């Protein structure tokens, strides 16, 4: 595969539809697989997850319900989940299924545990029926099943080296530079990346629902009152989409690098500003493609789940690059936008997926616009400031090091605080 083809493949692999927050939905996906392998009615199911999955799934709405959390997602998947639907595993859900799922929880059919001592994304589902038992393990990536067992017999297992085509494909982007990504976006036939437009339309659709129905906090609705202001409009659209998604509104979003909220930030500021400034469709698509690629590039260093808010430090940085491109910025200005953003917003913590994420996305969009505007005026934060370096690539690597090695205890403390509130 040539380098151009590889970047197209990375985009197609990392930019996919997701119905609901990806962490509880990843659990629902694992549950559906365990149920299918079991081949009979589930009598008991154990769901074991790492700290990040637990944190991100704790307070987020589940699509098509007014319920929150991993347990209800798992119970619903026992009722209606189909693994063939991937991150849209619960799309067949009806109102009649909700009481059935609640009954499973009430009868202690489903149990949720925090799995200690695991590194990175980890989901283990153990299902038992009258005669059979099944086990599914997901690691490193929301859809990356590394182990399937039935009655103690291994059906399928992936070695660590082969355990994630998706992760390995994502990390292939490290072999490119930001210049390579811009050159690709400049020169690729628009037909080859036109699928990006599907995500623009999808995320605009949920944004409209969020704003029209005043879902969530009402932040999008507040900002919408100033929609003649281009910047406020971009913030309103992105916040409104996030409020709809975090509320559990039953519409899919186009994700980016494994996260639906990343997809909202990577796409909607560019699409909204492009719309207001009457940029042509092709320019918007190319700009969003660059935003996705930079987001994926950063996530290859920060990891699928991180103690820092990826909507800020990954998708927000991607959006700043895409916005700079939308406004005909040079390569040097795109470098500058990336570094400005890293200098400004690094360190925003991720304390789980919930309605408050809408405000974090609002801050991310605002910062990405500021970073791009600064760069377009050749205002660059100096390379010797903080964690920045001479190149955008090295600055991103430094960001990854701080976000992983430097904040290794952060998730543990955040979760401790969240659980203390429940006691």
From Swiss-Prot:
Coiled coil: none annotated. GO terms for biological process: L-cysteine catabolic process to pyruvate. One of its GO terms (molecular function) is L-cysteine desulfhydrase activity. It comes from the Bacteria. Belongs to the UPF0597 family. This is UPF0597 protein CTC_02309.
């Amino acid at each position: 595969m040539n380098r151009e083809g590889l970047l197209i493949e990375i985009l197609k692999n990392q930019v996919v539809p997701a119905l609901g927050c990806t962490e509880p939905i990843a659990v629902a996906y694992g549950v559906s697989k365990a149920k299918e392998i079991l081949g009979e009615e589930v009598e008991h199911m154990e769901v074991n997850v790492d700290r990040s999955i637990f944190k991100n799934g704790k307070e987020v709405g589940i699509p098509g319900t007014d319920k929150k959390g991993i347990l209800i997602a798992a119970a619903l998947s026992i009722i209606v989940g189909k693994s063939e639907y991937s991150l849209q595993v619960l799309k067949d859900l009806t109102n009649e299924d909700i009481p059935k799922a609640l009954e499973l929880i009430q009868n202690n059919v489903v149990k949720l545990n925090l799995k200690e001592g695991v590194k990175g994304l980890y989901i283990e589902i153990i299902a038992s029926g009258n005669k059979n038992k099944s086990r599914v393990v997901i690691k490193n990536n929301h859809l990356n099943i590394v182990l399937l067992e039935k009655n103690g017999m291994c059906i399928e297992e992936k070695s660590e080296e082969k355990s994630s085509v998706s992760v390995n494909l994502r990390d292939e982007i490290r072999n490119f530079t930001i210049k390579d990504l811009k050159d690709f976006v400049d020169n690729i036939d628009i037909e080859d990346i036109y699928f990006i437009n599907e995500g623009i339309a999808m995320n605009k659709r949920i944004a409209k629902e969020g704003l029209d129905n005043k879902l969530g906090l009402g932040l999008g609705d507040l900002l919408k009152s100033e929609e003649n202001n281009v910047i406020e409009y971009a913030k309103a659209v992105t916040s409104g989409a996030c409020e709809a998604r975090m509320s559990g509104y039953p519409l899919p979003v186009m994700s980016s690098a494994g996260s639906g909220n990343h997809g909202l930030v990577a796409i909607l500021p560019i699409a909204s500003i492009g719309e207001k400034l009457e940029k042509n469709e092709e320019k918007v698509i190319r700009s969003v493609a660059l935003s996705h690629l930079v987001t994926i590039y950063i996530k290859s260093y920060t990891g699928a789940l991180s103690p820092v808010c990826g909507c800020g430090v990954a998708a927000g940085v991607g959006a700043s690059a895409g916005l700079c491109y939308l406004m005909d910025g040079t390569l040097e200005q795109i470098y500058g936008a990336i570094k400005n953003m890293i200098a400004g917003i690094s360190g925003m913590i991720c304390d789980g997926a919930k309605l408050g994420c809408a405000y974090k996305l609002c801050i991310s969009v605002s910062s990405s616009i500021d970073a791009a505007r600064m760069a377009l005026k050749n205002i660059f934060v100096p390379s010797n400031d903080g964690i920045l370096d001479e190149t955008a690539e090295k600055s991103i690597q430094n960001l990854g090091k701080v976000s992983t090695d430097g904040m290794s205890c952060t998730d543990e403390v955040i979760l401790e605080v969240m659980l203390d509130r429940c006691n």
